[in-house]
């Protein structure tokens, strides 16, 4: 049995100080990648590879336009980001919230919860599939990244 005298001791016992390095490392990598996308414009030809799904089928995948959306967000242009890939903008917001919760749980020594409940995962999968289909249907061109 472990007796905990204070919260700081609890963090030390659970490895909280070292464990916090993981979410901070993920944040550093995400910020570095965002910085690169902010500097190297994905709207200019030749900087990034073409989407293989788009190249093979001629249809947009759910990720098409995500780099351009991140580029626009990095420059503070929310409307352009939403025009390029609205799903990516919403997903990035969710990832930021999930990261904050991960950091908080790690810093306070609470156990990690990696998976959401099944209904959330199935709903997300359904939303991705629906977005994928609708952005390629005539009349829904406002979802295309062009």
Per-range role (PLM):
Residues 45-83:
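Extracytosolic (periplasmic/ER-lumenal) interhelical loops and adjacent juxtamembrane/interface segments
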Residues 31-38, 128-136:
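Aromatic-anchored segments of alpha-helical transmembrane domains
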Residues 132-146:
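Juxtamembrane boundary at the C-terminal end of a transmembrane helix
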Residues 1-26:
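Polybasic, low-complexity association/targeting segments
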Residues 8-10, 42-49:
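Short Cys/His-rich Zn2+-coordinating modules
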Residues 111-127:
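Interfacial loop-to-transmembrane junctions
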Residues 18-36, 82-113:
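Short Fe-S-cluster ligation motifs
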Residues 47-52, 81-86, 113-116, 143-146:
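Non-cytosolic membrane-interface motifs at loop->transmembrane helix junctions
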């Amino acid at each position: 049995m472990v007796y905990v005298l204070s919260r700081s001791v609890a963090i030390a016992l659970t490895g909280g100080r070292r464990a916090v390095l993981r979410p901070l490392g993920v944040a550093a990598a995400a910020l570095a990648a965002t910085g690169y996308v902010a500097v190297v414009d994905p709207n200019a030809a030749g900087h990034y590879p073409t989407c293989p799904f788009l190249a093979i089928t001629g249809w947009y995948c759910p990720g098409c336009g995500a780099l351009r959306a991140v580029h626009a967000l990095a420059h503070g242009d929310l409307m352009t980001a939403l025009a390029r890939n609205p799903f990516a903008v919403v997903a990035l917001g969710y990832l930021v919230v999930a990261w904050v919760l991960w950091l908080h749980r790690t810093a306070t020594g609470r156990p990690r919860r990696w998976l959401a409940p099944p209904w959330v995962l199935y709903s997300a999968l359904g939303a991705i599939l629906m977005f994928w289909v609708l952005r390629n249907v005539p009349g829904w061109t406002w979802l295309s990244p062009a």
